[in-house]
Amino acid sequence: MPENNPKINIVIHRGVNQIGGCITEVATEHTRIIIDFGNNLPSNKEKELTQEEISQLTNGIDAIFYTHYHADHIGQFALVPNTVQQYIGEGALEVMKCKYRTLSKTGDFMQELCALNRMKTYKPDCLIQIGDINITPYYCSHSAFDAYMFKIQANRKTILHTGDFRQHGYLGKGLKGTLRKFIGQVDVLISEGTMLGRLEEKVLTENEIKRNTAEVLKKHKYVYALCSSTDMERLASFHAACMETGRKFVCDKYQKSILDIFAKHGKNKSLFGFEQAFTYPHKETEKVIGHLRHHGFLYVVRGSQEWLIKKRMETYNDEPAYLVYSMWQGYHNGEEAVRLPNVMRIRDIFGNRIFDGTKDGFHTSGHAELQTLHDVCMITQPKTGVVFIHKDATSSPQYLHLPANIQVINNNDNNVEFIIASDNPLGCNNMRFGFEIG
């Protein structure tokens, strides 16, 4: 290969055969960046990276870009050496700081807070140049607020790294337009493939969850909703259902601070403004109790708030309380490694008075289902091929029914490395895929 033939190296350090723990490196001769540096999920039996391994992996890295703030994508951020610049969305950084400031009241999270204070931010649609690599973030719908996909350009080549995304959220309607207008055809598509291994999972739109929640609120006066405190679109569904039915949308001070960040950065103020959110006061008053007994409520709770639910149920006891379980089913009925005892105890409080997740229409995935994955491949038409990450080892893209001109770059090893230097494959072995200008 001629020495003056520029190339791009892509290394999937982790994520080809596992959901979460994603680490993807993109490098030219002069510049190296990493997309996401996440923790392994609890179900993963592999040992987590040590501080020494993280230092070795990031040695010579010019920047790390995070697609969003879920731990399986950003969890190692506090262990990254100070010499490596890290980037995340503006709203996402505020959420992270809010979370760790709250945690620091009961534990030592100084290392995390210091790392967050050093972290830089990017803006949607605004190019950032790191050496000879250009990175442009584009907003996408996910179960995390302020999530992005990245268009990466270098050496006249284009890579799209989707991060985690979906089309069935409120913000998902802009996906195809963004791909057609701002991305176009790419050389390599690096796409999440979570749902490739969940063919039977029911996928609802957030709007359907809103309608289902509204029906529950019409029938029941006191409803507790167990969900992620940072899932903006799910919380917007619950808030909208309360506004439609006249119920009060109730939360604690921490949740309200997260909602305020959503409202500050959210583009759709009517949906993401959370104007009617009611912060339950530290000291109850007869006025507050009377107000909520009269109107009824949907009370947003977290897995750590078993005590709060019991306390509120003692106060608001004139009618039975119900639980909207809006989380992954595996947290209560999965393998032991992924079950959350606090979630199971909260469910036990309500007995059979539970509107149960995906089964009953109150939860949906934060990840693209098969048709959306197919559509992204067809719109971007990757010249070299598509690599699916963030997927189980047994997942297969065969159900996408992609045309023959779209090559799925596959590898059975956890570490995949390949080079983009042309549109024509020279061949590959278990560890390396090579391409040369024809």
Where are these regions (language model features)?
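His/Asp/Glu-rich metal-coordinating catalytic cores
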Residues: 2-65, 71-233, 237, 243-244, ...
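Conserved beta-strand termini and adjacent loop/short-helix elements that scaffold enzyme active sites
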Residues: 13, 122-124, 138, 252, ...
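C-terminal regulatory/interaction regions
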Residues: 18, 244, 276-438
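Short connector loops at secondary-structure junctions
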Residues: 38, 194-200, 254-264, 352-369
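Short, acidic/turn-prone active-site loops that include or flank metal/cofactor-
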Residues: 39-40, 91-93, 165-166, 253-256, ...
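Short, charged/polar "capping" segments at the starts of alpha-helices
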Residues: 43, 94-97, 198, 233, ...
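Short, charged, surface-exposed secondary-structure boundary motifs
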Residues: 44-46, 96-101, 147, 170-171, ...
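Hard-cation-handling environments
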Residues: 198-320, 324, 378, 389
